[in-house]
């Protein structure tokens, strides 16, 4: 059978550098850092005392008090970002066939704050099991797409992909394939995460995964810099409306880009460390290109996973060298995590959005905070250091990798109106 074409017709973002798509792009294009000392709790005794929190987000601006209490922050973020994307796409919810609209969402952790607080309350009690009746439905990762579908009446496929930091990229690839195969007309996809909590910070600190640059929070996320010392935890959500091309054209939708391919692979190497030679990462990019029917030379821009970890950044660039060869020096490579921090399960969504907006505006956002050259990194790479660069982008790639060796890659193509 002939596969259907899939396009992006709506975007929504709730990030540490902007609470809407417009604000997010302004932050990206100007090299804004979303990192600051933690305000959600007293982090004085933590090894890392900073994170990329949302700024000026008040749940009561979007939900009544009763509704807000029933939702963990990760689900609140999902509803807010998906609403923006649905509105941006101009979907007519009164006439659309809701049996052919799905919600496929990504969350690596889900309701961590809810889980943490309920366990603390129980531990501080007398052993009597007094739990909030909303404990489980607030915590489970699948509640985010469930609530999106309940709010809008979408009755197509509805589930959450859980693959650590690759979660929302996997969700997008599933959404792509459902539409390509003709099973849906529209899918709301993306991801959300809210792990800036005592448990989140403490857990990642125990793994020695986070930067401890407490004297310079804004400069802590520094992908590809020789002095990088771990990732910075972020939070938020990204939402994309994926739609069958002819369906989008028929209703006169504005099209941001075409989703032309998705690839997945596994490192099969270690629980948390990447394969040092980037074998799984090499394979996922090759799989994505093959799925799209495109050549390495077609790619103009790569938004890397680029977490600012000593091992991960080098392994990814090794893989890029293997896949793209001499063409690698022609590609604008960046890591927007230098600005947003690492949104875990939402990373693939917000970074895909960054790639799509870079394509739209012909401007590649910078990799900020770079000051010391890493001798293990080929100097011929254009890592878009410290300042945005103008670039005509016809094809953009977004890489996302997760603990457990999960690798996902999504490819977007500019589509002429």
What are these regions (language model features)?
Residues 1-67, 246-256, 353-368, 413-417:
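ACP-dependent fatty acid/polyketide chain-elongation machinery
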Residues 22-27, 113-128, 178-181, 201-214, ...:
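A glycine- and small-aliphatic-rich helix-loop capping segment at beta-alpha/alpha-beta transitions
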Residues 5-9, 36, 215-292, 301, ...:
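Condensing-enzyme catalytic core mediating Claisen C-C bond formation in acyl metabolism
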Residues 8, 23-24, 29-163, 192-201, ...:
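Conserved beta-ketoacyl condensing-enzyme motif
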Residues 1-8, 97-98, 292-298, 329, ...:
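Flexible, low-complexity linker/loop segments at domain and module junctions
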